[in-house]
Amino acid sequence: MQVIARGIRGWIGLLGLLLALGLTSTSAWAARSGEFVTPHTRYWIDPQGQATIDEVLRLPPDALQAMERPRSFEIDRGALWLRYEVPALDAARRWSLVLEGGAFTNRATLYAPGVGGAWQVQDAGDHLPVAQWTHPARMPVFTLDGAAGTAVWLRLENHPAPLSPSLRLQDAQDLQMSRDRSQLWLGVYLGFGLLVLFLGWVHVRLYGDRVFIAYVAYVTCMLGFQIAFTGLGGLFFWPTLPRWNDAAPALFMLWLTAAGIWFVREVSALSRHSRLLYRFATAWSLFGFLFP
């Protein structure tokens, strides 16, 4: 019987050790840099977009729903509130919450508990000049300083496009590496585009052909769209122009489409095949340039 008892105690001890290791590894995994933490949030939609952080805190617990998986929200002129509990973080590293794909989110505000009960507020979004963001970047970045279990609140606005929030937890080193990597590849892409633009302009000067003029316009609009869409424009080229930063991706897309129709019209010599199609392509191209 003593042998059996010792065996049972041994198994219990082993199970306890495995449980402790499992909890430790789970905690470490929860704080791993680079992890997408959107499924760990809970959300509430404010239909009017007027609720303050204090009013949100007074909501009943069942008003918040678990995110569980990536979702898209049609909130019109309302606001989406996300509640995220800070996991156990390595205090030796600085941590940030990154709103990926948020280069053209209208407004993103993070509320974190501060000293004396006051809220520490961090602002971003293309309705605010990038130069006035708490942490100017291509996309909204928020610092996390709270202890494990601290609840932070992220308020998001976006009209008229839907919201598809994607939150990533990153330490300072990973954040800087991802910035450097993305800017390197964007620089390579834009550098190649500028080379193509230069060669197109050389052909315009050499031949004076309208095909090359249309091609130069198309490449220019394409580069402008990429600069605006990726957030490089707001960060480097127009950091104090929020209205332009908000409208630029849509405008450049319209102009890109119009320039593409113009280029196809010229390169295919459409006037030789159908005067009706030629006039239609001309009107459609002009509409794209003048509609904004």
Model-identified regions with their sequence ranges:
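Short, flexible coil/linker elements and helix-boundary hinge sites characteristic
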Residues: G22-S25, R58, F237
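Bacterial N-terminal signal peptides
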Residues: I12-T24
